[in-house]
Each structure stands twice: as structure tokens, then as C-alpha cells.
Regions:
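Solvent-exposed beta-strand sheet faces enriched in polar/charged residues
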Residues: 7, 63, 226, 275-277
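Hydrophobic side chains in well-ordered alpha-helices
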Residues: 72, 210, 233-234, 260-264
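ABC transporter nucleotide-binding domains
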Residues: 4, 11-182, 187-188, 192-201, ...
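ABC transporter nucleotide-binding domain
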Residues: 167-255
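C-terminal coupling/interaction segments
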Residues: 255-293
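ABC-family P-loop ATPase nucleotide-binding domain
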Residues: 1-10, 291-293
């Protein structure tokens, strides 16, 4: 069952096209991750699905409704990059206040437990660590007992332990049948959490699929070497080839690495420091986004 979707959604800000006719959908119990460099359109997609902005063309739907309608809003929880709450209120006061906005909120104790806030209920928000503050913002996103969570870079700036702790709570929400739209800069995060990944580049979908499918979409193998050949010469050797530079090294992503290596040696007998490895998700992501820029 589709919970939320964008259909041929386009959004412009003056001369800038933030989204150019994209399609995406989130099913019940699914975590969809949006990846992309700054300016790729991730936050714009989030704003459309939350009803904070309206597409110039196409449609945004949550539970089959306009996301600005009350029924859609009360079934949606959000944790945004710009989220701020008063630092002089206690954790329990924030949760109680936000819960009052919803018709069927989670019980207070369940919200605290689901966000990992046990023992912090009486603490002033301003006295919390960065990781604890993110847990509170996550609690405010789930306290209304939503069917879908929209999380815009929820672990940005957190240390590894805090990040992994929040991952556990997100996984628990999905395991209970919730749906999640997650934007992130952390490739490891998408790899660990997402059922499906969409890579955005300049407002368009550059790739979509599971983590393994994204790696295959970019290339099966990474060839790293020092060569005198230019990018244009390398790309012309085979189909589905991406190139990027790392200092004196050239990194080539190719689905047929054997053919590519033979071609490199044929055109540049002086090539050296050759290494062929499997492409990871981060490398696939870079190859896709740089290849579409």
C-alpha cells in the first residue's frame, strides 16, 4: 500500500529548478532514503510531502490526500534540519505539549521508551547533549503516533554512538509497520537502514533501487590507477563508465573492468599503480552524482 508519493513533481524557485518532474513513492513499512549532494532537491521533496510547499506541477499525496489536509498532517511526524524548541522547557513538557496537538497520541511512557529518553524526562532541553537533543526531536516526531515519519538528516552532527542509537529507534518504528522518508548525507546510514534508495542530482532522479542495485547501477568494479589518459578518452572505451580524480590517481567505475583494463593498457602502456576492487555504496554514489552533473 502506498502511503506517500510524488508524481511528476516539479518545483522552481525563480530561475532555479529544484525538482524536475520526479516520481517517488513510500509503501507501508518501508524506509526510503533520499541521497544527493547539497542542492540536489532532497529538502524540497521533503517540504512537498509535508505540505510546506506546493509543487508547480505534478502532485504530492499522503494517504491519498493533499499533505496540507488535517487528516494527512495528524498521521505524519517530522524531524527537520531546522527543528528548534525552547531550551527552558523540560523534556517531559515538550513531549506533553506536542502530544496535545494530536487526536490519538502515544502514551507518554511509550514515547520516552521509543526515543531512548529514560531518565531524562525532567531534564531541561538546554542542558542536554547534542545526541540527547536529537532524541527529543525524534520523540516529538513520533509522539503523535504517526503512520509515516519524515526525517531530514536526523543524525547530522552526531557522534557514531548517538547516530547508531537513533538508528535503533528508527528501525523499531519501521518494524512496527511505520513508513519513513529519510534524507541523509551518510552513505553508511542509507546502507544500514533503507529498503530502497533514490539518488537525486540537480533535481532529477539519477538512480533508484536497493543498496546493491545502486552499486550495480554505478558500476560493478572500481579501477584505480595513474594514467596519462583524459576523462573523455576513458569514457569512450566502454558503456556505463564514470571517472573521477583523486590527486594523481584516476578512479574509473566500469561494469566490465577486464575490458576497461585491457583498453587502458592498449592506449597507455605507461599506466601504473593499478588496483581493481568492488565499488562501495559511497563510491557508487559519487560516480552517479558526478556523472550527472
Amino acid at each position: 500500500m502506498v502511503i506517500a508519493e510524488l508524481r511528476n513533481a516539479t518545483k522552481r524557485f525563480g530561475p532555479v529548478t529544484a525538482l524536475a518532474g520526479i516520481d517517488l513513492e513510500i509503501a507501508r513499512g518501508q524506509l526510503l532514503a533520499l541521497l544527493g549532494p547539497n542542492g540536489a532537491g532532497k529538502t524540497t521533496a521533503v517540504r512537498l510531502l509535508l505540505g510546506l510547499a506546493k509543487p508547480d506541477s505534478g502532485a504530492a499525496r499522503v494517504f491519498g490526500r493533499d499533505p496540507r489536509e488535517r487528516d494527512a498532517r495528524t498521521r505524519t511526524g517530522a524531524m527537520l534540519q531546522v527543528g528548534r524548541v525552547p531550551e527552558t522547557l523540560r523534556v517531559c513538557e515538550h513531549i506533553q505539549l506536542f502530544s496535545s496537538y494530536y487526536p490519538k497520541p502515544l502514551p507518554f511512557a511509550e514515547t520516552v521508551r521509543a526515543a531512548g529518553l529514560e531518565g531524562l524526562e525532567r531534564r531541561l532541553f538546554g542542558r542536554l547533549s547534542s545526541g540527547q537533543k536529537q532524541k527529543v526531536l525524534f520523540a516529538l516526531a513520533i509522539c503523535g503516533n504517526p503512520d509515516i515519519l519524515v526525517l531530514d538528516e536526523p543524525t547530522a552532527g552526531l557522534d557514531v554512538d548517538s547516530r547508531r542509537g537513533l538508528w535503533r529507534h528508527i528501525r523499531s518504528f519501521v518494524a512496527r509497520g511505520g513508513s519513513v522518508l529519510l534524507t541523509t548525507h551518510y552513505l553508511e546510514e542509507a546502507d544500514a537502514l533503507a529498503d530502497r534508495i533514490i539518488v537525486l542530482s540537480e533535481g532529477r532522479i539519477a538512480a533508484a533501487g536497493t543498496s546493491s542495485e545502486i552499486r550495480q547501477r554505478a558500476a560493478a568494479r572500481k579501477i584505480r590507477c595513474i594514467t596519462s589518459l583524459g576523462d573523455t578518452e576513458i569514457v569512450a572505451m566502454a558503456e556505463r563508465v564514470s571517472v573521477r580524480r583523486d590527486g594523481v590517481f584516476t578512479e574509473i567505475f566500469a561494469s566490465d573492468s577486464d575490458r576497461m583494463v585491457r583498453g587502458l593498457f592498449a592506449q597507455d602502456p605507461g599506466m601504473h599503480d593499478l588496483e581493481v576492487t568492488s565499488a562501495g555504496l559511497e563510491e557508487a554514489f559519487l560516480a552517479i552524482t558526478e556523472g550527472n552533473s
